Structures are given as structure tokens and as C-alpha cells.
Amino acid sequence: ILQHHKFENEISQSLKKYNKKGLKIGIAGEHLMPFYLRDILTSSMPDVEFPIVTDILDDMRKIKSSKEIELMEKAAEINDSVLTELKKIIKVGMTEQQVVAHADFLGRQLGADLGSATVVMSGKNTKFPAWRASEKKLKKGELLMVDFNPTIGHYCNDGGLTFLLPGASKYKTNALINSHKILKETISSIKSQ
């Protein structure tokens, strides 16, 4: 039998030393914080104020230094390089897992860490909003979606590409071409505020 350790008491005891009048501890991402954790904080430190600072932090994150911009650009370059190289490597008969392995290896060769798991979906699996790559083999004429997220210096780029494997029908080919046109038109219409 596994015993699950209840850490609430230990956390509560550790937090009590911070219970001081006038102390403020900002909470960011309050919509993600479990209620039980909020309850531990407020009951352990009843004299502390817990202002919501999500908007303040979001505004601060909008301002980037030249170094941060450089890291973001580097992550984007790595993403582009990996997806470009994948186009040359991917073959009918490979598994989704093999595509993931190639993407992750290429990204790491270029010095990136992974911001999140690489998503590879092919054929019938492309109908899911997110997918854990499987041993499903890539088939002739299928769509293949790759979502790769390289991270450099804690800055992550999230980019994806939809491939059309050789042997696709005219319908799929036209659908992909038209989707790409719409995407380009949409991007060019976006204006900074």
C-alpha cells in the first residue's frame, strides 16, 4: 500500500513565520491556483494581504530587453531550421515517434532545450487538439502536423508545420494551399496597437 504524504501541515508551519501585519505577497495566475493551496496560504498567514498581480506581471512581460529579443529570435531560428530539416528527413513508413525523435535531436544539436513535448500527428490523429506521438506509421497522401517548441535561455518558440505526404489527393493539396494563403493574409492584416 502506498502512503500519500500530506504536506499541507508542513507547508502551513513553514509559512507561519511570514505572517506579519503589512506584508503583501502577490499572487499571479490565480485562476490556475488550486483552492486548497489558496486556503493554506490564507489560513497560515491571516495577517498577510494577497493582492492579485497577474495584470501587473503581464504588462511587465510585454517589455523586452534587447537580450530577451535576441533569445526569442534565436529560438525562432532554431524552430525554422528544425522544421526545414524535417521536411528533408520525413518519409512514408516512419512512425510519429521517429519524427519526434528527429525533431528533438535536431533542436538539441542546435543548442535548444524543449519548451514542451513535440507534438506529431498524422492521418486520423490530426483530428485531435493535441496528441502524444504514437507508433502509427506515416502513410502515403496523409497530412502530418508537427508542433515543435525549442527553448533558449528560458524563451520558448512555439511553431508548427503541416506537411502533405507524397501521393496526396488534389482535394487535400488544394485545402492545404488555401489554408496557407488564408494564414498569410491573416498575418499580414494584423496590426500592432
Protein language model annotation of sequence segments:
Residues 1-193:
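Active-site neighborhoods and metal-handling regions in enzymes and metal-associated proteins
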